[in-house]
Amino acid sequence: MSALTPASEVMLRHSDEFIERRVLFAGDLQDALPAQFEAADVRVHTQQYHHWQLLNRAMGDNVQYGLTVDAAFVAECDTLIYYWPKSKQEAQFQLCNILALLPVGTDVFVVGENRSGVRSADQMVEDYATLVKIDSARRCGLYHGRLDTQTEFNLEDWWESYQLHDLEVKTLPGVFSRDGLDVGSSLLLSTLDKHMKGKVLDVGCGAGVMASVLSKLSPKMKLTLSDVNAAAIESSRATLAANGIEGEVIVSNVYSDITGRFDLIISNPPFHDGLQTSLTAAETLIRGALKHLGVGGKLRIVANAFLPYPDILDATFGSHEVLAQNGRFKVYQATVARAPRDAKKKK
């Protein structure tokens, strides 16, 4: 997230317009532009914890992480710069929330890569603001308008659910596989045994599906779920509650806020950060697993078959096995066969 994205480069072409403005950045931020942006005041709201981590170092309390925006946090803002995400439902949710809090007359800028679907921005907000395209460069579009009417936002209106066997899965916009179980996760779930014991960590938990299924198969396992996405965190908590399942749900950038060791780590790790391809999270997941698994502990992940995870698994654990595969996905497992290095040092 160090280099500027094409969308941010387009914004910089208009940077002189913001010198005296009180700006709120929101949406699919992929770089540190807000930390170097010149304006009377700059604030950021993000649903992504790893984005908050980066920006918080430079901006402190002017960066807010959470599912929804705090009204007091944006009370003085007169300009919104919104980065369009790849999920249209996520954009609808975030804009409806933000535009319910900003005053009528607020300048609204929407920027995004054309492939993200940003061209539909004007239609999405036409009841609240008239957006006009004011720039096009780097395969991005920049739109501007003024808020004519505040939106009405009620979080309860955005919840959806679906049934998976005897489980009720609760989801919010922006959560992976919001409308049903994806093929990769289904393949991983097919490898889980019944009556396992110990502690399990579900990294990138989404709506909490995998951990919930595991709980039904092995009720004695102690569950910990983690994700960077605020919508996923709230969805997982709601899924556990709806099914009477006990578990701890933690906001964490892979292992950043995780302590202790586990008997099993499961994950369907992402290989995109927004629209950009990124293996960072998966590589961190694999390489950092030794510090969070006990002797005999297992890391079990599902991934697209073309991704280069076997080499990383072998370099980290010494070997791996393929538990299941289909035409697109493979389920890999690696086992800690000896005491992790940091444990040896303590002896």
Curated annotation (Swiss-Prot):
UniProt-listed Enzyme Commission number(s): 2.1.1.172
Q: Where in the cell is it found?
A: Cytoplasm
Query: What Gene Ontology terms describe where this protein resides (cellular component)?
Result: cytoplasm
The record's catalysed reaction(s) read: guanosine(1207) in 16S rRNA + S-adenosyl-L-methionine = N(2)-methylguanosine(1207) in 16S rRNA + S-adenosyl-L-homocysteine + H(+)
Keyword list, A-Z: Cytoplasm, Methyltransferase, rRNA processing, S-adenosyl-L-methionine, Transferase
CDD domains given for it? AdoMet_MTases (cd02440)
The answer to keyword Cytoplasm applying to this record is yes
Q: How does it assemble?
A: Monomer.
Q: Which HAMAP family match?
A: 16SrRNA_methyltr_C
Which family is it part of?
Answer: Belongs to the methyltransferase superfamily. RsmC family.
Designated name of the protein: Ribosomal RNA small subunit methyltransferase C
Organism field: Serratia proteamaculans (strain 568)
